[in-house]
């Protein structure tokens, strides 16, 4: 299975509440809320190289209750970049201790690159998992996700996602760069 995504960065005049009001009629599942803190790791030879198809990225995600900050779960994910942007094979497992997982990756030679801190509201439409992400340092986004068979035409699926996003008539722009790369690029610029 591959994960196919499309992201849309919202203009600063749109709030999360505005967005929920616009999208609510399309939801077919209740909205869940979570605070996700992702620690991203790369192999040493990838640190200064562009992410290309076949690149391997490790992520340790701590999911917290947004109200209490209590840890709900930790996940470790290997992402193998696909041929198209925002398309990857993902291999994921729950881990009992996110800190231990980060230490193991470091001991194996993986280098911690960036941390992504976001509040995610998640629901489903008929066709997609839809996420409203408030990403620290980046702003407010809509992210559409779908799991598809390995031989699915990711380009066609992303085009359909782009049409869905454009039909919402919300101010903003398509965003083709993953959150982790966007935040990393900010730190390189500054």
Where are these regions (language model features)?
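Short alpha-helix boundary/capping segments
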Residues: 93-96, 149, 153
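A generic structural motif
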Residues: 10-12, 147-152
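A short, sequence-level motif marking secondary-structure junctions
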Residues: 94-95, 135-139
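N-terminal strand-loop-strand beta-hairpin
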Residues: 1-127, 170-190
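Mixed-charge, glycine-accented linear interaction segment located at domain edges/termini
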Residues: 150-178
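Hydrophobic, well-ordered secondary-structure segments
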Residues: 3, 141, 158-162
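Residues forming anionic-ligand binding surfaces in small-molecule and nucleic-acid pockets
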Residues: 77-79, 137-145
